[in-house]
Amino acid sequence: MTKKDKKQKVKVKTVETKEGEKIRVFEDLDSFETYLRGETEDEEFDHVHCQVRYYPPFVLHESHQDPEKIKESANSHNKKFVRHLHQHVEKHLLKDIKDSLGVPELKFKDKSKEENFNHVVWRYHAPTAVRDREFLVHVTVECHNDTAMVDVDYLTEPMQPAVQSEQVA
């Protein structure tokens, strides 16, 4: 398969939740980023929910691009793995999301981290506007104690206009 063919193939499944919400689930990070770029062009960028589950690039690099050779210690219990994952998220994933949306000034100021025995979760939230449409971007990144796979949940919601209270004169 040529490089051109790989770029054209978007690996995605659409899953419907019990509430009727449709979530797009991607098999790799490149397909996810390609989809975000396409949604920005298609005017559907302010109401998107998708997920991607992938091995971080630094993990694949250490295993020479072979998922079978990934060390069992590459998980949320390993401080080095968690540190590298956080750097990957801050310096690459969030930056790629900004670029895909076409909003380089997007700042994820509302951040939180939750850590327990089973997983580590980072949550990022940021309000933004594209083509005069305001919306909130929510990104949740989760790593688990039993695998090097990372789960990313990406959600955008239109901002509700402020309800103005009517004053009675």
From Swiss-Prot:
Principal location class: membrane
Question: What superkingdom heads the lineage?
Answer: Eukaryota
Q: Which UniProt keywords apply?
A: Cell membrane, Membrane
Membrane topology per the record? Peripheral membrane protein
What is a single cellular component term in the Gene Ontology annotation? plasma membrane
Q: What is the similarity comment for this entry? A: Belongs to the RGI1 family.
- Its biological function? Involved in the control of energetic metabolism and significantly contribute to cell fitness, especially under respiratory growth conditions.
State the protein's name: Respiratory growth induced protein 1
- What is the protein's species of origin? Eremothecium gossypii (strain ATCC 10895 / CBS 109.51 / FGSC 9923 / NRRL Y-1056) (Yeast)
- Which gene is transcribed and translated to give this protein? RGI1
